[in-house]
Amino acid sequence: MPLLQIAEPGQSSAPHQHRIAIGIDLGTTHSLAATVLSGKPKVLNDVQNRRLLPSIVHYGDNTTHYGEEAKPFIIADPKNTIVSVKRFMGRSKADIKFQHPYELVGSEKNEMPAFETRAGRKTPVEISAEILKQLKDRAEDSLQNPVNGAVITVPAYFDEAQRQATRYAAQLAGLNILRLLNEPTAAAVAYGLDQESNLATDRNYVIYDLGGGTFDVSILRFSQGVFEVLATGGHTALGGDDLDRLIVKWAKKQLNIDVLSDEDYAVFIVAARQAKEQLSTQDSVELKLLEATLTLDRPTFESIIQVALDKTISVCKRVLRDAKLELTDIQNVVLVGGSTRSYAVQKAVREVFAQEPLCTINPDEVVAIGASITANQLIGNSQDGSLLLDVTPLSLGLETMGGLVERLISRNTAIPVARRQEFTTYQDGQTAMLIHVVQGERDLVEHCRSLGRFVLHGIPPMTAGQARIEVTFQVDADGLLTVSAREATSGVQAHIDIKPSYGLSEADTERLLIEGFQHAEEDKNLRHLKETKVEAERELEALEQALKVDADLLDEKQLEALNSAKESLKAQLEGSDIQAIEQAVQQLKVHSDAFAALRMNRHIDHALKGTKLDDWSKSN
């Protein structure tokens, strides 16, 4: 759906003017850019006719090297050669658990870490910006025109912090970012799944993305011009590198080797990778390992990696359940990522989905191609009417009394989206409210991830439960969250843009999802207990306030019975027997309802005192 642009009077651009927009795949291993020329997507080469830019930056004494030129320094100068910077985006120093050769500076929690390099301290955002700047320069050199806008792809599991870090990097690189696009969505666009001739009915697609280090799967639906991501899932420690390691493990067993030196391990890994690639077109290959030679055929290779393939299929089935679809509901399966070149991978997908997967576009380039098509559409060059809707990877909500989570936006909700809900005060005279925003699938705040807090001040003093605070969650097309709160009577309001200083790793995101599934029943029971306790505490609080004012209405026996019921409820609140708490609440209400009737009579008497019957009749 092209965006309408409004120009200043007398400054409208010519109707035929083509604006330059590019799609960028900012990858962990390599990055690339593409654009649409004469209606067709084209991957942009550098001056040496290379399409892929290795995502590597080396900081020397007086110069900086990028891509292929930086590669030799990985061994020669590892501390000043940054590779796989994407893994550091949106994380704190404490989040970075994996092994790396770098000297990181920064506090353990809230501060963005930086790499200590010969050129000074460099943050992941700055390094990513340098890679993006290389791609921007490549595009402008190739097209001989300035770039007007860019669509940058991100993994479906990137959270708000990681997406925001990507936006900052684009801004530092001088790019006008049109939007961030989930990588699987970009792949679907590249294959033109929204352009198929038979679109009278809804069509569902699986995007199976097996890269070097991670696996992602998405289910998309195209319906009446709208391209919607129904569900996403993945495995953060599963990719082509893991297939290579499985081959190495097999080879070690064949050769009766327990431990390999670092140098020998490198030889085994290279041989395993070559064998894996050759088996895509050959029935068998030879692995030359040290002074031995092993033969590996397709059936053996398939049995070696079956455990990894089973994991990917398990994720596919889970995402199908999330989307409430059966295997027979899927019209096409798209293969993305270099690891899907493997014959064994293609065979596994073919057998599970009972259809031939789409793999005609270079899997290393398909994401950038899809991003370029979307960029061309958003910049206004294309009249294509399809609309892309990504989804939220985790649920978003806020904390309520008792440490419970009230979800406003559920996971796998299409974005952009806004949700609004009313809340109220807990105590009499409450003039401020803390809004605590959380992310996750559990029912208790302590089991979810805190995204941020802000306070709404200036609430007019009222009786508990009378104030009306309207809270709005709004997620934009890039997956970035804004939360606002407004008190209805006074109009006071406050808001927060969720830009955490550090984010979730993909593994953390996956862990939160799995824990949500595993603890669903436990959380349901715990939530019931917490809600019961909150309601009981509210009854006790209201009773305490009433006794301060009108305790004289009760005789000694009534007061003793009420206090006894009150203490009994307090005792039950120390435990976790829901039925016992509910019974204690009901017993308290037997006595407190009689007390409430006495209070009501007193207040009516006060209201009518000194009022003539005729005056009262006239007023009614």
Swiss-Prot record:
PROSITE patterns recorded: HSP70_1, HSP70_2
CDD domains: ASKHA_NBD_HSP70_HscA (cd10236)
Protein name, UniProt field: Chaperone protein HscA homolog
Lineage, top ranks: Bacteria, Pseudomonadati, Pseudomonadota, Gammaproteobacteria, Moraxellales
Keyword Chaperone recorded: yes
Keywords linked to the UniProt accession: ATP-binding, Chaperone, Nucleotide-binding, Stress response
Family note: Belongs to the heat shock protein 70 family.
Entry's Gene Ontology BP terms: iron-sulfur cluster assembly
Organism: Acinetobacter baumannii (strain SDF)
Family annotation (InterPro entries): ATPase_NBD, Heat_shock_70_CS, HscA_NBD, HSP70_C_sf, HSP70_peptide-bd_sf, Hsp_70_fam, ISC_FeS_clus_asmbl_HscA
Superkingdom of this protein's organism: Bacteria
Record keyword Nucleotide-binding present: yes
Function comment: Chaperone involved in the maturation of iron-sulfur cluster-containing proteins. Has a low intrinsic ATPase activity which is markedly stimulated by HscB.
GO MF: ATP binding; ATP hydrolysis activity; ATP-dependent protein folding chaperone; unfolded protein binding
